[in-house]
Regions:
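Active-site acidic catalytic loop and adjacent metal/ATP-binding pocket
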Residues: 34-84
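Short helix-capping and hinge/turn segments at secondary-structure transitions, especially at repeat
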Residues: 26-29, 33, 37, 59-64, ...
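Helix N-cap / loop-to-helix initiation motif
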Residues: 118-122
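Active-site activation/catalytic loop segments of kinase-like enzymes and analogous catalytic loops
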Residues: 84-117, 130-149
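ATP-dependent phospho-/nucleotidyl transfer catalytic cores
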Residues: 1-53
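ATP/Mg2+ or Mg2+-diphosphate-binding catalytic cores
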Residues: 137-177
Length: 177
């Protein structure tokens, strides 16, 4: 952010990013406080101790379907973690594409719980993950790791789409509490 602020001639992406930054930073700080006050650390340590395996990149790109059901592929990011993290990744991407539709979100959560019921700590962990503005920080990371002399128009478009979806995402997160 300091790099962007000190630039005399800002790109449209940089100007828009700086406008949105305070809101998303406040959200990230609030989620950090929630994590510290929650049982997330203990849950994470327990999952590692119990060697609970997560895919690590669970998305529609790594799922194939045949007559017998779904098959997950590409386990390059496989790790020990809280298993709800795989569902969270899949869920967030679907919800972004579906405009954070509350009905769909609740149907997905209920379907997941029919197969693998969530305890209170896991559900809290899921809600905390959803509350974190991951997409904003992903765009920020992409910007800071790229050549800043030329920023693709697509980056600005993604930032604008994120801003438009943000209210719906926050409403859904609030609805879950």
């Amino acid at each position: 952010r300091n790099f962007m602020r000190t630039r005399k001639k800002k790109t449209a992406f940089e100007s828009r990013f700086l406008e949105l930054y305070p809101e998303f930073m406040a959200q990230a700080e609030e989620v950090t406080r929630r994590v510290c006050a929650s049982s997330s650390y203990a849950l994470h340590r327990q999952c590692i101790r119990e060697r609970r395996v997560c895919h690590g990149d669970y998305s529609q790109h790594n799922l194939f379907f045949d007559r017998e059901g779904a098959v997950a592929v590409n386990f390059a990011r496989c790790c020990f973690d809280v298993q709800i993290s795989d569902f969270y990744q899949f869920f967030r991407k679907i919800m972004e594409k579906q405009g954070w539709n509350q009905k769909l979100g609740m149907e997905m959560i209920h379907a997941y719980q029919e197969v693998r019921p969530l305890g209170d700590a896991e559900f809290e962990n899921f809600c905390i993950r959803l509350a974190y503005p991951e997409k904003f920080w992903k765009l920020a990371n992409h910007y800071f790791n790229s050549r800043k002399t030329w920023i693709p128009e697509k980056s600005l478009q993604k930032l604008e789409i994120l801003d438009m979806q943000e209210k719906k995402r926050r409403e859904f997160v609030k609805f879950l509490h």
